[in-house]
Regions:
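Glycine-rich FAD pyrophosphate-binding loop
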Residues: 39-59
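A conserved short coil-to-beta-strand element within the FAD-binding core of flavoproteins
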Residues: 190-205
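Extreme N-terminal leader/targeting segments of oxidoreductases
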Residues: 1-22, 37-41
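Core beta-strand elements of the Rossmann-like FAD/NAD(P) dinucleotide-binding domain
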Residues: 18-20, 214-224
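Glycine-rich Rossmann-fold phosphate-binding loop(s) that bind the pyrophosphate
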Residues: 27-28, 50
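Short hydrophobic core segments
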Residues: 25, 220-230
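C-terminal accessory subdomains/tails of enzymes that are appended
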Residues: 11, 20, 51-52, 97, ...
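Dinucleotide-binding Rossmann-like beta1-alpha1 core, especially the glycine-rich loop
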Residues: 63-148
Length: 560
């Protein structure tokens, strides 16, 4: 129980009025990566996250660790090379959350890519990204393309490119990186908002933190303060009076989820839209998800929501490339909207703005990491910690070791790399029956939790009676107990949205088990009736947002 929601207060009380080497603001993939890199080099590190871990951009992406083929179009060769090479590292360090996925890129007469440009583009991509031989691109003619995916539009189809991307669960990736950081001595707290800075002689030396669950205030000191708050980095720079020069430009991306019965896509596709953008359609766990939009966004970054226009745009894109499926809004089972924190570039559309990352340091010494991509999180973290350790060394601290995260498994990833994963899963599937699980349930646990599965097996043994008491099957209760005791799950929405991804990919399961889950959490975390009602309402709002566009919600509220 190293990272339990029951120990949040202990962590906050333990660092109150204390000084650490590094304070990281933001518990998304960037902040988690910095915590892991810093802790493994011997820096005392704490992460403060004002929502839940990965609640911002890091649970709302296209869920691909991808090399950024489209950046070749913008001639961002260095980014493609760096990010492409990182994909394989991210995969090997956590093969239970990231997996290779062959992607089909169909090309039609008049489309973005033609046969020649696709062939050359993918070859350059393979070269830059250092793609291993078995995953190098293939080129298909019209018939081969339709064999791979018969739903693709036949009219004007000339052929297709076939190349490997890596599919991930972004929120799981984030929490696994954070858990590994905790194993190495880092600390992290969710629902802990940094609402101001502490200064000494004009230099930032600490933060004021509010526990958003009970309103208590803490002061924590740090030799270096890193602002890794994603869409909120400028908000923190304003508090530091240092928002000048470069700034963020937020862009919103929406994805829709459709059941495979209605959209039986057998193959991940990267395809043209009518307005010459490109979007992904990806099969996953009995569903197909499609996205993303890319539009400038100036509303509350904490609650980006799908609009009717967003939904219509994606439905039109689906029906343009897959005309036989005839998707309508009735087919949309769930959705999510996220905000990309891009670095503003004058005169560029949202899709044209670079996804590169940069470090900015203010006069007070506040270090901000801005921009960047999910795929590049490890490299970004290494760069930030290199920067921090150099500063500390200049100030007289002894030298710190170099980063070692390149070959370091994340939590759950201790399965002897991708080559060891299938045998590991098979072995654990066979062991599960000893703990009251079916073979299928044990296999699902092993796939989902990787090398942490033994902890879940142990919990299954201990909580058998509780499962009966709270009227939950083991395969619901055990992930919940694990999420609370080992993944600092403080609210029902943390469990259903981020720890399990169920609001997006298994929304009926959420409706089935939400009441039992809420009752269990209320009992174990000692909620008042008011707290239970508040957290229940939060989950209901997340379920509504997944299905009903925000403008329709506003219209309904106005009429009520």
């Amino acid at each position: 129980m190293k990272f339990s929601s029951k120990q949040r207060k202990d962590v906050l009380n333990g660092v109150n009025k204390q000084e650490l080497d590094v304070i990281v603001i933001g518990g998304g993939i960037t902040g988690s990566g910095i915590a892991l890199d810093g802790a493994t080099r011997g820096l005392s590190t704490i992460v403060f996250e004002m929502q839940d871990f990965a609640a911002g951009t890091s649970s709302r992406s296209t869920k691909l660790v991808h090399g950024g083929l489209r950046y070749l179009k913008q001639l961002e060769v260095k980014m493609v090379a760096e990010v492409g090479k990182e994909r394989a590292i991210v995969y090997e360090n956590g093969p239970h959350v990231t997996t290779p996925e062959w992607m089909l890129l169909p090309f039609h007469t008049g489309g973005t890519f033609g046969s020649f440009s696709t062939s050359i583009g993918l070859r350059v991509y393979d070269f830059l990204a250092g793609v291993k031989r078995s995953e190098r691109r293939k080129m298909f003619n019209r018939e081969e393309t339709l064999n791979k995916e018969p739903l693709v539009k036949k009219e004007g189809l000339k052929g297709g490119g076939y190349y490997v991307e890596y599919r991930t669960d972004d929120a799981r990736l984030t929490i696994e990186v954070m858990k590994e950081a905790i194993e190495h001595g880092a600390k992290a707290v969710n629902y802990a908002k940094v609402d101001g800075f502490l200064y000494k002689d004009g230099k930032v030396c600490g933060v004021r933190v509010i526990d958003l669950l009970d309103g208590e205030v803490y002061e924590v000191y740090g030799k270096k303060i890193v602002n890794a708050a994603g869409p909120w980095v400028d908000t923190l720079r304003e508090k530091d009076n240092s928002k000048k020069g470069k700034v963020l430009q937020l862009s919103k991306g929406v994805h829709l989820v459709i059941d495979q019965k209605r959209f039986p896509l057998g193959q991940a596709i990267y395809f043209d839209t009518p307005d010459k953008r490109m979007v992904f359609a990806i099969p996953r766990g009995g569903k197909t998800y499609v996205g993303t939009t890319d539009t400038f966004y100036d509303k509350d970054a904490a609650v980006p929501q799908m609009t009717t226009e967003d939904r219509t745009y994606i439905i039109n894109a689906i029906n343009y490339m897959f005309p036989s499926v005839k998707i309508t809004e009735k087919d949309i089972e769930s959705s999510w909207a996220g905000v990309r924190p891009l670095i503003y570039e004058e005169g560029k559309s949202a899709s044209e703005i670079s996804r590169k990352d940069e470090i900015w340091t203010s006069e007070s010494g506040l270090i901000t990491i801005a921009g960047g991509k999910l795929t590049g999180y490890r490299k970004m973290a290494e760069m930030v910690v290199d920067y921090v350790t150099n500063l500390l060394q200049k100030e007289g601290h002894s030298a710190y070791p170099k980063s070692t995260t390149k070959h370091m498994p994340i939590s759950g990833g201790h399965v002897d790399g991708s080559k060891g994963l299938p045998a590991f899963i098979a072995k654990k599937a066979g062991e599960g029956t000893k703990y009251g699980l079916t073979t299928a349930q044990a296999e699902e646990f092993a796939k989902f939790y990787g090398s942490n599965v033994d902890i879940l097996f142990d919990l299954a043994k201990k909580h058998k009676d509780e499962a009966k008491e709270y009227n939950m099957p083991l395969d619901v209760l055990i992930p919940l107990v694990y999420a609370m005791d080992y993944e600092m799950t403080a609210k029902p929405v943390d469990f259903f949205v981020r720890r399990r991804g169920a609001v997006f990919f298994n929304i009926h399961w959420v409706y089935e088990w939400k009441e039992a889950v809420i009752n269990y959490m209320a009992a174990k975390l000692g909620w008042s009736k008011e707290e239970q009602m508040k957290y229940t309402a939060e989950l209901e709002k997340a379920l509504t947002d997944a299905v009903v566009p925000v403008d329709q919600q506003e219209q309904a509220a106005a009429l009520a």
